[in-house]
Regions:
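NAD(P)+-binding Rossmann beta1-loop-alpha1 motif at the extreme N-terminus of oxidoreductases
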Residues: 1-51
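Residues at the C-termini of beta-strands that transition into short coil/loop
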Residues: 30, 49, 61-64, 103, ...
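Internal alpha-helical scaffold of NAD(P)-dependent oxidoreductase catalytic cores
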Residues: 91-92, 115-120, 135-238
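Generic structural signal for residues in well-ordered beta-strands
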Residues: 26, 59-60, 121, 174-176
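Rossmann-like NAD(P)(H) cofactor-binding subdomain of soluble oxidoreductases
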Residues: 52-137
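Short, well-ordered alpha-helices that flank and scaffold nucleotide-derived cofactor binding pockets
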Residues: 17, 21, 87-91, 114, ...
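NAD(P)-dependent Rossmann-like dehydrogenase/reductase catalytic/cofactor-binding core
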Residues: 219-313
């Protein structure tokens, strides 16, 4: 199976490195200094799960036409780069290609369908914390690394099961689910609500927890996600809210999301995932007739967050 990793950031490099080490027929779509470093020294992976090693893919490049059609593509770009990514990826997509997006956001397949040639677009999630320490060097620090994927309509293609098997043999836990909609919403409820809270209070988890009645506010924020999901026919487990509150209580005080960090580092709103993570929830709330005041306020504040932030406990 010819597999392409499109987007060699923290997620793409983690998966790509594992597959390359396992001898999979894997290719990297990579540009700039990252590509230069990998061509010269190989991809350096430092992982709590996989260990420390260097690998080279079967091939890499930055021109989609040079790869030919792929059997499977993992899309691991930033949400704000989705439109350009689909455009650049199109030459590698055939009628039988399966595309698995591993982006922040919920049910990204809905956004991709109008942008790609006819193919099979799944949805996917991954539980991992990884980042590029420097060009050509990915560091994975936490999370199980588990990939969950599936077609939104529950009609999963055999190639998804083959892909899951390849991932597992490479050391990455993987599962094909008949209910990817719930898994996608659950991950979004965690990541999206965290991002909303950090933007809303302009600070990390420790600052949020020091607010008066903070647990009430946190509960209201995650309830907005649960209610919008319910309007789309996705029912969360009854224990989800309490589990989320317990998890938020346990976060290290300096915990932030990549969206909040990007905003505080001074990146322009359009160069971050503000629209994918916060703006889309506001839009879905309006479409469903569900009030989402916490997310609306967080979205408004996100465009104002430009000052560097410090660590708080």
């Amino acid at each position: 199976m010819r597999i392409l990793i499109f987007g060699m950031g923290g997620i793409g490099s983690f998966i790509g490195g594992a597959l390359a080490r396992a001898g999979a027929d894997v290719y990297f779509y990579v540009r700039g200094k990252n590509r230069e470093a990998i061509e010269k020294e190989g991809l350096h992976v430092t992982s709590e799960i996989l260990g420390d090693f260097k690998v080279w893919p079967k091939g890499m490049g930055q021109d989609g036409k040079s790869f030919g059609k792929m059997d499977a593509i993992f899309l691991a770009c930033k949400g704000n780069g989705l439109i350009n990514a689909c455009r650049d990826m199109a030459p590698m997509v055939g009628n039988s290609t399966v595309v698995v997006p591993l982006l922040n956001g919920v049910l990204v397949s809905d956004l991709m369908a109008p942008l790609l040639p006819p193919c099979f677009i799944a949805d996917g999630t991954i539980r991992v914390f990884s980042h590029m320490e420097k060009p050509g060097h990915v560091v994975q620090t936490a999370g199980s690394g588990k990939v969950v994927m599936g077609m939104k309509d529950g009609k999963n293609r055999p190639i998804l099961y083959e892909l899951a098997d390849i991932l597992q043999k490479a050391g990455i836990p993987a599962e094909v689910t008949d209910d990817i909609r719930l898994d996608s919403w659950e991950k979004y409820a965690l990541m999206g609500t965290n991002s909303a809270l950090f933007c809303l209070f302009d600070g990390p988890a420790g600052k949020v927890r020091r607010q008066e009645n903070y647990r009430k506010i946190v509960a209201e924020a995650v309830e907005e996600v649960i209610t919008v999901a319910r309007a789309q026919g996705v029912i969360f487990p009854e224990t989800y809210k309490e589990n989320y509150l317990a998890l938020f209580d346990s976060l290290p005080g300096d915990t932030v999301t990549s969206l909040y960090r990007d905003l505080k580092d001074g990146k322009k709103t359009e160069d971050t995932e503000t629209e994918m993570i916060l703006g889309r929830m506001v839009k879905m709330g309006k479409e469903a007739g569900v009030p989402v005041p916490c997310f609306e306020k967080a979205y408004e504040k996100a465009v104002l967050l430009t000052r560097p932030f410090g660590r708080e406990g």
